[in-house]
Amino acid sequence: ALGVVSPEDKEIKSVEELKGKTLIIAKGTTAETYFEKNHPEVKLQKYDAYADAYNALLDGRGDAFSTDNTEVIAWAKTNPGYVVGIETLGDYDTIAAAVAKGNTELLDFLNEEIRELGKENFFHKDYEETLKPVFGDDTDPDSIVVEGGEAGKN
């Protein structure tokens, strides 16, 4: 899913609040596709590189920045004065291993391992140990972690 980060003193909490404002995005990203398709009324300011996009937000060239929620949540934690007002927006996109078409043996093996790890709540436990120190207490692990191969499930 996408997230939207903005200055704390001008927090954007809904897509409706982006009307009349400038949203910074990186070119060729899911954020660009999502906003062009679903919210053409939002003015987009596009950058070729993420560093340029974040610098544009820091410099005040736009009102907010949108990209993958995991990225904006972590960025806001390390940049005081910024907050993620929209933590989950659009489709849940997952970053996961891929298997070549036709390799059913490997696919079946991985799917079974993921199901078994899900029964142990492995991914949430791993989140607590590795990612929670980055994202903090106020981030919902279910907005980041897929457990047992099913989004939004514990």
Where are these regions (language model features)?
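Structural recognition of the beta-strand scaffold that forms the well-ordered cores
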Residues: 3-5, 22-26, 44-46, 64-67, ...
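A ligand-binding cleft/hinge motif common to bilobed small-molecule-binding domains
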Residues: 37, 51, 58-91
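Periplasmic-binding protein-like
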Residues: 1-6, 73-114, 134-153
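Stable alpha-helical elements in mature extracytoplasmic
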Residues: 14, 31, 49-53, 68-72, ...
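Ligand-binding clefts/hinges and TM-proximal coupling segments of bilobed small-molecule sensing domains
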Residues: 30-47, 84-86, 114-154
